[in-house]
Each structure stands twice: as structure tokens, then as C-alpha cells.
Amino acid sequence: FKNKSSKLIPIKENLVDKLDHKYAKSRVKKFYRIKDEDAGQVSSKKISQLLKILAKKSIEIQFISSPENIAWLLNLRGNDSNFAPIPNCYLIIDKNKNIYLFCDPQKINKNLKKNLKFLQIVNIKFLGAFLENIHNKRVLIDETTCSFFYQNILSNQNAVIKEVDPIYHLKSIKNKTEIRNTIKSHIFDGVA
């Protein structure tokens, strides 16, 4: 590209999604929540812990682009990967506890929607437009998981703080249930 004076231009639509549209509809797999007793901690407590960290750093909004962190925070799981129960989604949380989950709405059944009544479910195709409407805020992103495209959108009108997602730290402190389940999974993995 260098010698040909080519230039990469970002586009708003994912061209692969346009080609894969019919196939994608036939393979929609629903999200689900794990029981609080299986997670060892209710998601509301995890959210409160995260909000305390954000308040200490004077962060007004966090854009969470790591699906595994969203899975942990909400006790939410998905079948979007063959090898891990990770839901393909993004999350925005603000200092006032407004939470927006961006995903394919077909992946949310009525029962799950009731369980997630503390947040708003937004079609993932509106994520870019939603981010463009955030102005004059201190926004935390983790640049190791946030795409350059979304970083650029947020940087246009906001003070973007690039730090490691604080959820990684919260996840590293295991509760008794998580420790017990980790030991179980190692045993099952060893037997296999």
C-alpha cells in the first residue's frame, strides 16, 4: 500500500455481515443468564462495585467492549462462540446507573428481557449512532478491546480515558463459588 499511495477508509457497515445475512438469521442462538448462586454474586453488586471505581476516577461513562467482561458483570452467557459461552455484545454504563446492552435483539427471549429489566436492550446496529450522540463526557475505554472505529467516534466529542477495564480487576477477586467451580472444572478437564 505504501508505494501505491493507497489509503484505507473506514466504513460504517461490516461488509461480511451484508453477505452473511441469510445464514446469520438461521443460526441465531439465544443469550441466557446463569443463576446468581452459580455465579456466587448478584450482578447488581458487581455493577455497584464497578460504579464505585468509576466514581473514584471521575469517569462519567464506560464503554465496555470486552464480551467476557459483560458476561461476568451481568451473569450473562451466550452461544456465539463454539468454545466459550460468550455473548457477542457491547455495554455502556454511566455514573447514574443507566445501562445499555447492545446486541442482536433476536438473542433475547421474553424471560431474559424480564431478568434484565434494570437495563435497556438496544439493537447493535445502532451502536455507532448512539456513541456519536455522547458529548462532553469523560469516557473510559479499554484500548486493547475497543476497536479503532469506536475509539474515533468517542474521541470526537469526549475526553477519552484509555485504561485497562476495571472489570478485569473485579473478576480477579474470586468468591467461594467461583473458586469451587474453578477446582471442579480443572478436575473435569483433567479427566477428559
Show the residue positions of the predicted features.
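Active-site neighborhoods and metal-handling regions in enzymes and metal-associated proteins
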Residues: 1-192
